[in-house]
């Protein structure tokens, strides 16, 4: 009867500028312990899954085997229960800088800007009717 909730640990994208850019989480014992505590808390809160973003691969692998909800990785190694990627990053709509794990498969952002530029050039060539 509740709302399904997916938890999120590791990098929180909305904090990238505040923390000085993209970086891996879980490199220190203190950070690893904090991630473990957060994952357990999310499990206990009833999350149906937990996103592990930009985490140390070994820590993510350990967490995947220690919590019941699936651990869905995004830049956290191949030992997670599943993988996701932000579509805008994958297709090249996100401006730089990108996280180190993102390898865009297209450059739709650049293609879109080029298309808009062509449109503007064409529009400026249309004669203006004087009233």
Task: Annotate the PLM regions.
Residues 1-131:
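Alpha/beta enzyme core
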């Amino acid at each position: 009867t509740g709302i399904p909730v997916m938890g999120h640990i590791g990098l929180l994208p909305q904090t990238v500028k505040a923390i000085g850019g993209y970086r891996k989480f879980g490199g220190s014992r203190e950070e690893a312990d904090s991630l473990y505590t957060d994952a357990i808390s999310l499990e206990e809160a009833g999350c149906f899954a937990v996103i592990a973003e930009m985490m140390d691969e070994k820590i993510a692998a350990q967490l995947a085997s220690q919590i019941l909800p699936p651990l869905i990785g995004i830049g956290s190694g191949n030992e997670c229960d599943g993988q996701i990627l932000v579509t805008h990053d994958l297709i090249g709509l996100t401006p730089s800088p990108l996280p180190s794990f993102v390898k865009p498969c297209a450059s739709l952002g650049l293609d879109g800007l080029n298309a808009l530029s062509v449109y503007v050039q064409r529009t400026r060539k249309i004669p203006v009717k004087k009233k």
